[in-house]
C-alpha cells in the first residue's frame, strides 16, 4: 500500500500518519529524515546532497527522487510506504510518475485556514519540559503558566500567527495544486483519491481512513 498524505501544516497529518503506520505496518518516509539518513550513511546520493546543503542550496528534485527510489527499495517498504512532505510540487509528482513510482492512495486532510490559525497560534509551550497547552482546546489551569512548575509559557516562533499564515500561503501556492493533479490521476483510474474533513475528531478521521484503506 503506497500512500501520499496531503494537507496544510497544522491539519493533523502527523497524527494520522502515526495511525496508518501502526495499523498497516508501513514506514513513514519524510524527505528530511531520508536526507539526514543518506548523509549519515555516506551513500553517493547522500554525499551529493550534503555538498548542496553545505553550500546553503536547495536539494534538486532529481536528487530527492533518487533518494526516494533508494529508500523504497529497502526491505521495510515491501508492504508499502507513506510519503510525508513529498511530492510538494507538480514537477516532483511528474518526476515520481516518470520514475515509475506508482501510488495506491492519495489522502487529503482538509482544514480551513482560519481553523489552522486558531489551532496553531493558540499553542503554548513550557520551555523547560516541552509540555504543550492550547488556549482553547487544552488550557493550563492558570492562564499563561505551566501546571506543574507555575513558570511562564511561551509561543514557539513557528506558531506565531504571521508565520502560520506565511506557511499556509506557501502551501496554497505550491502544494494545493497537487489536489487537482491527483484528482485527474484518480479520474484516469491510476490511483484512489480520498478527501477527509480534518475538523472532525482525530478518532473520526482515523475511522474513515481505515474504511478506505482496506
Swiss-Prot record:
GO terms for biological process: AMP salvage. Gene3D superfamilies: P-loop containing nucleotide triphosphate hydrolases. GO terms for cellular component: cytoplasm. Its main location: cytoplasm. It catalyses: AMP + ATP = 2 ADP. Keywords: ATP-binding, Cytoplasm, Kinase, Nucleotide biosynthesis, Nucleotide-binding, Transferase. Pfam families: ADK (PF00406), ADK_lid (PF05191). Pathway: Purine metabolism; AMP biosynthesis via salvage pathway; AMP from ADP: step 1/1. It comes from the Bacteria. GO terms for molecular function: adenylate kinase activity; ATP binding. It is found in: Cytoplasm. The keyword Nucleotide-binding applies. Belongs to the adenylate kinase family. Catalyzes the reversible transfer of the terminal phosphate group between ATP and AMP. Plays an important role in cellular energy homeostasis and in adenine nucleotide metabolism. Consists of three domains, a large central CORE domain and two small peripheral domains, NMPbind and LID, which undergo movements during catalysis. The LID domain closes over the site of phosphoryl transfer upon ATP binding. Assembling and dissambling the active center during each catalytic cycle provides an effective means to prevent ATP hydrolysis. Monomer. This is Adenylate kinase.
Amino acid at each position: 500500500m503506497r500512500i501520499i498524505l496531503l494537507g496544510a501544516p497544522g491539519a493533523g497529518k502527523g497524527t494520522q500518519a502515526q495511525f496508518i503506520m501502526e495499523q498497516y505496518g508501513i514506514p513513514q518516509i519524510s524527505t528530511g529524515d531520508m536526507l539526514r539518513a543518506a548523509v549519515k550513511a555516506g551513500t553517493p546520493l547522500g554525499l551529493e546532497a550534503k555538498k548542496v546543503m553545505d553550500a546553503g542550496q536547495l536539494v534538486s528534485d532529481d536528487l530527492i527522487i533518487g533518494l526516494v527510489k533508494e529508500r523504497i527499495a529497502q526491505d521495510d517498504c515491501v508492504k508499502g510506504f507513506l510519503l510525508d512532505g513529498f511530492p510538494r510540487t507538480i514537477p516532483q509528482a511528474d518526476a515520481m510518475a516518470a520514475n515509475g513510482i506508482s501510488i495506491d492512495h492519495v489522502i487529503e486532510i482538509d482544514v480551513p485556514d482560519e481553523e489552522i490559525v486558531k489551532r496553531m497560534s493558540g499553542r503554548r509551550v513550557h520551555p523547560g519540559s516541552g509540555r504543550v497547552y492550547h488556549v482553547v482546546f487544552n488550557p493550563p489551569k492558570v492562564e499563561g503558566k505551566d501546571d506543574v512548575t507555575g513558570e511562564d509559557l511561551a509561543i514557539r516562533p513557528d506558531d506565531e500567527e504571521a508565520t502560520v499564515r506565511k506557511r499556509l500561503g506557501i502551501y496554497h501556492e505550491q502544494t494545493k495544486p497537487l489536489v487537482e493533479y491527483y484528482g485527474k490521476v484518480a479520474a484516469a483510474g491510476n490511483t484512489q483519491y480520498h478527501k477527509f474533513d480534518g475538523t472532525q475528531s482525530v478518532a473520526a478521521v482515523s475511522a474513515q481512513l481505515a474504511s478506505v484503506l482496506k
